[in-house]
């Protein structure tokens, strides 16, 4: 099981919905793998201390308390989320930024109504430590999705997907 922990306002559901669609696609490609989404304030972080996983910062953080990100987790954050960036500066966790700037790790290359090209701008390692080279991903959307939830969901997809040749994705 790969845990995905969401940190932010519970009523902000756009990231949750996009992640659920991405996880459904991942289950079809990576048969036998399970992906579980948890809300930070509803789970015990100690349960994940020996796990690999993904920690996603939502656009609005809401509650203020010390954030603990398990050691084997990769953080995913919007480049515009200054509160999350402040949290990440205080702890030693690898983070992938998502946004519309060429400085971001995952960035929009082109966009139309239900199709998006997203560029991975630099080398990253997936959840198993395997190298993923810079490349473009074509995403066919089943419904309109805002930019940050889309980038977050695609980043989780790329980090968890075993088939690194899979660069045309639907969710």
Locate each region found by the language model:
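Phosphate-binding loop of NTP-binding sites
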Residues: 1-76, 83-94
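Short, low-complexity, polar/charged sequence segments that are solvent-exposed and flexible
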Residues: 55-57, 74-77, 94-97, 114-118, ...
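Conserved catalytic-core segment of NTP-binding enzymes
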Residues: 78-82, 86-103, 108-115
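Adenine nucleotide phosphate-binding catalytic loops in nucleotide-utilizing enzymes
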Residues: 100-171
């Amino acid at each position: 099981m790969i845990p995905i922990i969401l940190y932010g306002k519970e009523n902000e559901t756009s990231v949750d919905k996009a992640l659920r669609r991405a996880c459904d696609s991942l289950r079809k490609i990576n048969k036998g793998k399970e992906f579980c989404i948890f809300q930070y304030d509803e789970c015990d972080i100690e349960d994940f201390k020996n796990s690999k996983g993904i920690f996603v910062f939502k656009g609005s953080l809401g509650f203020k308390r010390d954030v603990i990100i398990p050691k084997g987790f990769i953080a995913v954050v919007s480049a515009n989320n200054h509160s999350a960036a402040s949290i990440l500066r205080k702890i030693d966790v690898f983070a992938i930024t998502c946004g519309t700037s060429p400085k971001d790790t995952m960035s929009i290359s082109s966009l139309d109504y239900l199709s998006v090209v997203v560029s991975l701008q630099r080398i990253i390692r997936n959840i198993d430590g395997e190298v993923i080279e810079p490349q473009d991903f074509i995403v066919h959307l089943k419904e309109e999705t805002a930019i940050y939830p889309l980038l977050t969901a695609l980043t989780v997809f790329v980090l968890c997907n075993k088939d690194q040749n899979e660069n045309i994705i639907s969710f």
